[in-house]
Amino acid sequence: NTPNTLMTRTFSKIYGLASLRVGWAFGPRSMIETLERLRSPFNVNGAAIAVAAAAMRDVAHTDAARGHNNRWMGVAVQRLRALGLGVTGESGNFVLPEFPDTPGKSAADTDAFLQSKGVIVRRVDNYGLPNHLRITLGTDEEMESVLNALTQFMGGSDG
């Protein structure tokens, strides 16, 4: 009974279906009716809807993805803090380590080093976080790669 609250969710994170551009909204009828009037006709195709519905029924996959995410969140936070980095954003599917504002060790320098190693992370300067990088939790191999590269860059061993 909260007339101005709308909950929205995507299928991009836990379900791994970002390319389908599908999601859902739950809220008061008046807000849903407004969304219906504003959205483009045929804004989600039938195949995307079918895949999203199947993903919602695949509880085993969702549980496995959540477990993988939780495990790597803990590992990533621990290893980043061991490198002396502050960590923000310990929920969701990414972490935001804060890098020193020191020439040679800044977020920009770190990003350039990671790119040279084939590791892509996201700069977040445009969100007012010039000393942070967004690291999305990935596969075991991807996580080992980014964490080992960061360890190497920050002056520790690579592994």
Residue spans of the language-model regions?
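PLP-dependent aminotransferase class I/II
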Residues: 4-81, 85-88
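Thr-Gly-centered strand-to-loop micro-motif
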Residues: 9-10, 97-98, 122-124
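Short acidic/glycine-enriched loop/turn segments that link adjacent beta-strands
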Residues: 19, 91, 128-131
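Residue-level recognition of strand-loop junctions within catalytic nucleotide-signaling folds
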Residues: 28, 57, 100-101, 138
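Alpha-helical structural signal in soluble globular domains
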Residues: 1, 75, 79-83, 113, ...
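Conserved PLP-binding catalytic core of the aspartate aminotransferase-like
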Residues: 70, 78-117, 133, 137
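PLP-dependent enzyme catalytic core of the Aspartate aminotransferase-like
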Residues: 105, 113-117, 122, 126-159
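Short, hinge-like loop/turn segments at secondary-structure boundaries
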Residues: 1, 24-26, 139-141
